[in-house]
Amino acid sequence: MSDTESAAARSYAEICLRSFGTGHDMDHTLRVAANADRLCSAIPGSDRLTVITAAFLHDIGRPVEHYCRGKACHAQVGAELVREYLKTRSAFSDAQREEIVNAVARHRYRGKLRPVTLTDQILFDADKLDSLGAVGLGRAFLFAGACNSRLHNTAEEALAGEAYGREGSGIHCCRGALERRCVCLSAEICSG
């Protein structure tokens, strides 16, 4: 991996995220890059330079999303910023540039785009790993406070959302089993 390119991407991210503290700051970025590096070590065929560069740059669109009050998607804004940034970097092939841009565009859990390539998936997983444990809990409180938002959804909101509301999902299977059990119990009560 090119230490020069990795250091340059880190420096650019530091500039973009300077004074931005909603839990998607440079500390988060460094943890994601470390997670990505560990994943690359364990996954044959991964392109460490491409993955680590994408990891350093993945949240550079966050300040725009924050200041627009969520009207802009940080992953999409970030992908465009990354595209412009990479035009100044000669160490990357055109294919690597596209891979990095696409990974940044596809890293958001709530985004419309899903990971497609190995680079996309490694970045996606490295980012999500940082939402686990005590650090993830602290980031959730920090983000909710900075955005003046709730930490949870009501059951109705959760079930109406895409993650829990899709047909065939675990929640629907459980709901169906529960409804069948209630019918059986009702029949027992009525007949007994």
Residue ranges, per PLM feature:
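Short alpha-helical hairpin
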Residues: 1-14, 55
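An amphipathic alpha-helix signature
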Residues: 6, 10, 33, 79-83, ...
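Amphipathic, well-packed alpha-helical segments that form the structural scaffold of globular domains
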Residues: 14, 34-37, 83, 105
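A short, mixed-charge helix-start or loop-turn motif at secondary-structure junctions
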Residues: 14-19, 64
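Divalent metal-dependent phosphate-bond-processing catalytic cores, especially two-metal-ion Mg2+/Mn2+ enzymes
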Residues: 18-26, 30, 34-44, 57, ...
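His-Asp-centered metal-binding catalytic motifs of divalent-metal-dependent phosphohydrolases/nucleases
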Residues: 48-70, 74, 78, 82, ...
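Hydrophobic, well-structured mid-protein blocks that either form specific transmembrane helices
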Residues: 85-124
